[in-house]
Amino acid sequence: MKRVVHFEIYTDDPESVQPFYQNVFGWTFQKFEGGPVEYWLVTTGDDKEAGINGGLLRPREGQNSGTINTIAVPSLDETMKKIEQGGGKICVPKMAIPKMGWLAYAEDPAGNLFGLMEPDTNAK
């Protein structure tokens, strides 16, 4: 079974909302260098506690603010085929996130957006 392993919060001004999440939830932020977009890693708690960490970034052109969950998959290519066969749509094609893996974004048949991540520390 594939699980949600990451979330992303999209906002027009990522720097301005960081204090909110820090003060309300105690989350910490670290800017991620080397990716395709300006991105902050969000740590929501100790790795020994249940839960997931995420990211904070600006929406892509035409995308609204909001939250997207990312699901870990063993093969991004196979999963993208299954999505299209099942009536879903690939919105952002496969791209490398250096030293982390391969990422794509898709919609289910109802239009709900989600991310897919195939871990691969050799991704470039």
Residue map of PLM features:
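Conserved beta-strand in the GNAT
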Residues: 54-56, 114-115
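Vicinal oxygen chelate
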Residues: 9, 30-33, 80-81, 85-124
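Mid-chain, well-packed structural core segment of small domains
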Residues: 63-88
